[in-house]
Curated annotation (Swiss-Prot):
Its cofactor is Mg(2+). Induction: Under conditions of iron deficiency and by the fur protein. It comes from Escherichia coli (strain K12). Changing residue 303 to T: Loss of mutase activity. Changing residue 359 to Q: Loss of mutase activity. Binds 2 Mg(2+) ions per subunit. Changing residue 304 to A: Loss of mutase activity. This is Isochorismate synthase EntC.
Length: 391
């Protein structure tokens, strides 16, 4: 295939180097420099302070402080399956920046990179994906499982290496209020994305989470767009899917917090392409918790795997023809004081030289339509396709 991939972006500052971590959120936005130590310990059982993951994390923070790093942070990504190696590291230093100023500078960015797509492949193809959805929907109508999240990929090969810093600027310009991230990986690649979903933020003893489940495509007409949002809010199918997520999260968080506040009904939030049902959680964590114990407790939520978790992940393993790896995982940071912020690794891409892999998923329940879920994942993929100029 010989598709044009032109980047019409604006530059006011140098782009981020591919070996630097970048995280932009309403709570804290920062970049990092250098690498003190990589940390690939699997996050399995990471919700326990006594787990190997948490014990080794604490030891690494102590080492960093002993070497003169005053306020060490652990940054990076944890895969969908926490039994797999983590992609985390402690940088030598970090630098805060203004989210508002970065939003403005990204809109003014003028540097361009022209690339050609030489190959583009959907994994799986549409017919196979729709068969997967039909099978999963049938299973969710049985006592075995209530919800399954199925995903698909797009692999793209370009004629030259891709500048992740240029893409990051365009991603921010197009998705200014998302949780934007750029994660350097040990293999030389980069995980880049604009997540709409906060898994866990912890500041002192207070924590928050805003799970998303249930979505609808935005419309260009303002009246039709609002109608689409209202239909989503009234959708029995989407409300059921959303409630499976929030109920599961409430059950596990109650035991780990002295306070927990959860609205009885979801609200609407938007991205440039989608409406989402969202429920904001607020709470006060027990004293032994840190941002990563709580993030690992929740991850993966039923919004990324399904419910019940074990049955849903078994269906995913049987139906999806690929390993999700970091997709559907979590991205963020945690400091040595237990504060941190972790978002769900969606609306994202993995880049390495001239190779790109995009990811999107959808929650499957008995009322799911195979064609409808193909289209929904297509809208979700459009977030990153738009960044590449492939509408």
């Amino acid at each position: 295939m010989d598709t044009s991939l032109a980047e019409e972006v604006q530059q006011t500052m140098a782009t981020l180097a591919p070996n630097r971590f970048f995280f932009m959120s309403p709570y804290r936005s920062f970049t990092t420099s250098g690498c003190f130590a990589r940390f690939d310990e699997p996050a399995v059982n990471g919700d326990s302070p006594d787990s190997p993951f948490q014990q080794k994390l604490a030891a690494l923070f102590a080492d960093a402080k002993a070497q003169g790093i005053k306020n060490p942070v652990m940054v990076g990504a944890i895969p969908f399956d926490p039994r797999q190696p983590s992609s985390l590291y402690i940088p030598e230093s970090w630098q805060s920046f203004s989210r508002q100023e970065k939003q403005a500078s990204a809109r003014r960015f003028t540097r361009s990179q022209s690339l050609n797509v030489v190959e583009r492949q959907a994994i799986p193809e549409q017919t196979t994906f729709e068969q997967m959805v039909a099978r999963a929907a049938a299973l969710t109508a049985t006592p075995q499982v209530d919800k399954v999240v199925l995903s698909r990929l797009i692999d793209i090969t370009t004629d030259a290496a891709i500048d992740s810093g240029v893409l990051l600027e365009r991603l921010i310009a197009q998705n200014p209020v998302s949780y934007n991230f750029h994660v350097p990986l040990a293999d030389g690649g980069v995980l880049l994305g604009a997540s709409p979903e906060l898994l866990l933020r912890k500041d002192g003893e207070r924590f928050s989470s805003i799970p998303l489940a249930g979505s609808a495509r935005r419309q260009p007409d303002e009246v039709l767009d609002r109608e689409a949002g209202n239909r989503l809010l009234a959708s029995e199918k989407d409300r059921h899917e959303h409630e499976l997520v929030t109920q599961a999260m409430k059950e596990v968080l109650r035991e780990r917090s002295s306070e927990l506040h959860v609205p009885s009904s979801p609200q609407l939030i938007t991205t440039p392409t989608l409406w989402h049902l969202a429920t904001p959680f607020e709470g006060k964590a027990n004293s032994q918790e840190n941002a990563l114990t709580l993030a690992c407790l929740l991850h993966p939520t039923p919004a990324l795997s399904g419910f019940p978790h074990q049955a849903a992940t078994q269906v995913i393993a049987e139906l999806e023809p690929f390993d999700r790896e970091l997709f559907g995982g979590i991205v963020g940071w945690c400091d040595s004081e237990g504060n941190g912020e972790w978002v769900v690794t969606i609306r994202c891409a993995k880049l390495r030289e001239n190779q790109v892999r995009l990811f999107a998923g959808a929650g499957i329940v008995p009322a799911s339509s195979p064609l409808g879920e193909w289209r929904e994942t297509g809208v979700k993929l459009s977030t990153m396709l738009n960044v590449f100029g492939l509408h």
